[in-house]
A protein has these predicted regions:
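Short, small-residue-biased leader/transition segments that mark boundaries at the very start
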Residues: 2-6
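Well-ordered alpha-helical scaffold segments within catalytic/enzyme domains
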Residues: 22-36, 53, 57, 101-117, ...
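Long, well-ordered core segments of solenoidal/helical folds
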Residues: 1, 46-61, 130-141, 184-194, ...
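Long, repeat-rich segments with strong aromatic
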Residues: 154-216
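Structural helix-adjacent loops and short alpha-helical linkers that scaffold large soluble proteins
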Residues: 31-45, 62, 111-125, 173-183, ...
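Non-catalytic C-terminal accessory modules of carbohydrate-active enzymes
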Residues: 56, 215-365
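Long, low-complexity segments enriched in small/aliphatic residues
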Residues: 123-164
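Acidic/histidine-rich catalytic neighborhood
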Residues: 49-112
Length: 365
């Protein structure tokens, strides 16, 4: 028997029922970075169990026949139903965040089952269910729609931007592959604004990095580091405490981890199936380097840049594999040295077949 319950005082956040799917995303991401099949075998029952739970709790939406979660909410925002601009409503069917989470979960379970060569019949069922999920929708004003219907939001500046999960940390939305949805996310973020609690600002740093806007991400990162304690009054708000703990307020470590993740997203991304160097470099970060940052597929990256342009990278394979590198926008060609041999590549990308421990040194011109 599978059960869930609404937690505590208010359904706007207590009815968030897809947290288990979000947690499963972390398990799958660990596999993507390590490519550890033994680990995948250990976590597969958890992924499959979560998918089975949601398969048994989703229902058919009456207007379109979509498969949706219900009852649920889009944390922690509320909306007005047509004809009533007074009463905030939270409980709904199939909010966009839930659709994104279950799409991601089912897709990951299918991929894991195929890698482990198991559960072919169950994979077929999940593939059918995936086709029944609602599409992500753009509102009449151009924003990414938060609910199945184009409802009016109670708070257009709400600190939560739950329906952008598919942009980050998910990978369902990107400027490269879904430009219209990415633009809808951009408009949504501009409408919500940059203000918010510490963790909210941290999440927005990651959003803007995924959209390729390093200057906006950097602006938010600086606001995240703004002193949380008012020197004159002793009161505190959003920002950072003197000990560098992030202030919600009060202290919540989400902002610390999220802010650090945002810097990583500004410098290196790999969620789209290729290695993207300096995808959201702020104009003010004219020169720098990093060492040992990891990418999906099982590689480590070192990178140097100068005058805002990538100059040299080292790709080290931690497992055998094929690694695709997108050419930086500022580069005309890349000279890649592997095993004493040098190869020249031009845009848009190049692929490296590397053995475990093998390095490829890349110079950009």
């Amino acid at each position: 028997q599978r059960q869930m319950c609404i937690r505590d005082r208010h359904p706007s956040w207590g009815a968030t029922n897809t947290g288990g799917a979000w947690l499963c995303a972390h398990l799958w991401e660990h596999y993507l970075y390590t490519q550890d099949k033994d680990y995948l075998r250990r976590i597969y029952p958890v992924l499959k169990g979560a998918a089975r739970f949601f398969s048994s709790t989703t229902v058919q939406e009456p207007s379109h026949g979509w498969l949706v979660t219900a009852p649920t909410s889009s944390p922690e925002n509320s909306f007005y139903v047509p004809g009533d601009s007074v009463t905030p409503v939270s409980i709904c069917m199939g909010p966009t965040m839930d659709v994104q989470l279950l799409t991601e979960l089912y897709t990951n379970v299918i991929a894991a089952a195929r890698l482990l060569d198991c559960d072919a019949d169950y994979v077929a069922k999940l593939e059918v269910d995936l086709k029944r999920f609602p599409p992500m929708q753009i509102s009449k004003e151009g924003y990414l729609q938060e609910w199945l219907e184009d409802y009016k939001e109670v708070d257009v500046h709400h600190r939560h931007v739950s329906h952008l999960y598919g942009l980050h940390p998910g990978n369902l939305i990107s400027p490269e592959f879904t430009p219209e949805l990415a633009e809808a996310c951009r408009m949504t973020l501009n409408r919500r604004g940059d203000e918010g609690t510490g963790w909210s600002r941290a999440w927005k740093i990651n959003f803007w990095a995924r959209l390729g806007d390093g200057n906006r991400a950097w602006k938010l990162f600086k606001s995240l580091l703004h002193p949380a304690v008012d020197a004159a009054t002793g009161g505190h708000g959003s920002g950072t405490f003197p000990n560098l703990f992030c202030s919600h307020p009060p202290f919540q470590i989400d902002g610390n981890y999220g802010g650090a993740a945002g810097v990583g997203e500004m410098l290196l991304q790999s969620h789209e199936g290729f290695i993207h160097l300096l995808p959201a470099l702020p104009d003010s970060w004219t020169a720098g380097n990093f060492r040992g940052m990891r990418v999906r597929g099982g590689a480590s990256i070192d990178l140097d840049w100068k005058d805002g342009r990538a100059t040299r990278a080292v790709v080290t394979a931690l497992v055998p594999g094929k690694f695709t590198v997108k050419m930086p926008a500022s580069a005309v060609r890349a000279e890649v040295t592997v095993g004493g041999h040098t190869y020249t590549y031009k845009k848009p990308a190049f692929s490296l077949d590397l053995n475990k421990g093998e390095e490829a040194t890349v110079c950009f011109f």
